[in-house]
Regions:
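Buried hydrophobic packing segments
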Residues: 61, 120-128, 151, 212-220, ...
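Phosphate-handling active-site elements
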Residues: 72-73, 93-94, 125-141, 220-231, ...
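Histidine/acidic-residue-rich, glycine-tolerant segments that coordinate divalent metal ions
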Residues: 81-88, 103-111, 115-119, 134-250, ...
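Metal-dependent amide/peptide-bond hydrolase catalytic core
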Residues: 214-408
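Non-cysteine beta-strand/loop elements that form the S-adenosyl-L-methionine
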Residues: 97-99, 193, 343-349
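Divalent metal-coordination and catalytic microenvironments
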Residues: 44, 98, 114, 140, ...
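Acidic/His- and Gly-rich active-site-bordering loop/insert found
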Residues: 20-135
Length: 408
């Protein structure tokens, strides 16, 4: 049976008009939240809380989501200031993760802009809840202590994010972009134990743990030549002894070891461990390997990044730019190593202004900050709506994720 061209065009026109109406309703719903989200942002900014102590922010966000009909777990993975809020649209469907941070910096308050995230993510979640016309499960996560104890890492280890189909975050920035790659990280304290003695009267009776540390540093310099060029290894001495006239029976050095590949990093870490064991052996000390935390690398899903950045441009986010080529490590990678995920970074400071600075802090309650909250919410919400309403798009993103992960 031959399809009538005029009917086909009419069907397409009706579909596009309906989709445009849904998008317009979604954006209008989010915009209607501007005033309340600004109030929330300003409250967070004026009441900065350190990691795992974000009780005020936790209370504000969970109360808000509960008032919108979300079912809220107010403690997750043993973290008192973590939460999980769930809403099933039309009985539930693909699980969409929306993550936010809200911890501040000691002495600098919200100089990393985490005050923006909760309002932006909640605005996206509420807008979607009120307007979505297809089955979906919206899951908002409060993830504490990004700056210190890495709440997402704790939650990821317990499988909290494993059932998500896709995950999103928002962060302030000096331009509007998406996160590219991030580096896998192992943060370790390497502790050497020796034997104390009087350094002048009987040094031969001592075993210097500090000597082991110094030998370890020398060994690391030789190791650098034999690891991939993208590997980063940097360390400090955190304890070198108590007095110069005592042979130190204890010394400690802390190291950050990074690579763009978790598999490659695991291999390098084993070699670092051998260097430490060798340093201890040379002086007769013992070595204790204390791993503080380990981040995976972010798995980059180009199709998802492109989609998110396209929608950020559609909603008018300023100063669109390509992803950063050089980056550090983040606990969000503990999520994106498990499920497809993307972080939309929205401009609210001038180009070249870095986070953890006074200038970044000074912009926390400006009009630019308020606008960034809205741009982030709208860009992420439009992306979620497009994924849920475009046949095959989610499956393609998940396939791209698996292929990208296989390349690391």
């Amino acid at each position: 049976m031959r399809e009538c061209n005029s009917c086909s065009h009419r069907v397409v026109h009706v579909y596009c008009a309906r989709k445009e109406k849904v998008m317009s309703q979604l954006l209008e719903e989010i915009e209607s939240l501007r005033g309340s989200m600004k109030t929330l942002n300003d409250f967070f900014f004026d009441h900065p809380e350190l990691g795992n102590e974000e009780f005020l922010a936790h209370g504000k966000l969970t109360d808000l989501l509960e008032s919108e009909g979300f079912t809220v777990d107010r403690e997750v993975s043993g973290l008192q200031t973590a939460f999980r809020a769930v809403y099933h649209v039309q009985g539930g469907g693909p699980k969409i993760g929306l993550l936010c941070e809200y911890d501040a910096l000691e002495g600098l308050g919200h100089a990393c802009g985490h005050n923006l995230q909760g309002p932006s993510i909640c605005a996206a979640a509420i807008g979607l809840r009120r307007t979505l016309q297809v089955p979906a499960t919206l899951v908002v996560y409060g993830t504490p202590a990004e700056e210190t104890a890495s709440g997402k890492l704790v939650m990821a280890k317990e499988g909290v994010f494993d059932d998500l189909d896709v995950a999103f975050m928002m962060h302030g920035s000096d331009s509007t972009t998406v996160d590219g790659k991030s580096l896998a990280l192992n943060l370790v304290n390497i502790k050497f134990h020796g034997k104390s003695a009087h350094a002048a009267i009987a040094p031969e009776k001592g075993i210097s743990a500090l000597d082991a540390v110094l030998l370890f540093f020398n060994g690391m310099e030789y190791l650098r030549e034999h690891v991939p060029t993208e590997v980063r290894m940097h360390g400090i001495i955190t304890d070198g002894g108590k007095a110069a006239n005592i042979v130190p029976d204890y010394a400690c050095t802390q190291w950050y070891i990074r690579s763009s590949s978790r598999i490659r990093l695991d291999e390098v870490v084993e070699r670092v461990k051998q260097v430490a064991q060798g340093a201890a052996l040379q002086v007769g000390a013992t070595m204790e390997w204390d791993e503080v935390k380990a981040y995976d690398n972010k798995v980059n899903v180009q199709s998802l990044n492109d989609l998110l950045l396209k929608n950020a441009e559609i909603v008018g986010a300023p100063d669109i730019s390509e992803p950063r080529k050089v980056t550090g490590s983040t606990d969000f990678s503990s999520v994106t190593f498990r499920v497809p995920g993307a972080c939309l970074r929205v401009k609210f400071v001038g180009r070249g202004v870095t986070s953890h600075s006074q200038e970044w802090l000074d912009n926390g309650k400006t009009q630019l900050a308020e606008d960034a909250i809205m741009y982030g919410a709208k860009g992420i919400a439009l992306t979620v709506e497009e994924i849920l309403t475009t046949p095959g798009l989610l499956a393609q993103i998940q396939e791209d994720f698996q292929q990208s992960k296989a390349n690391y």
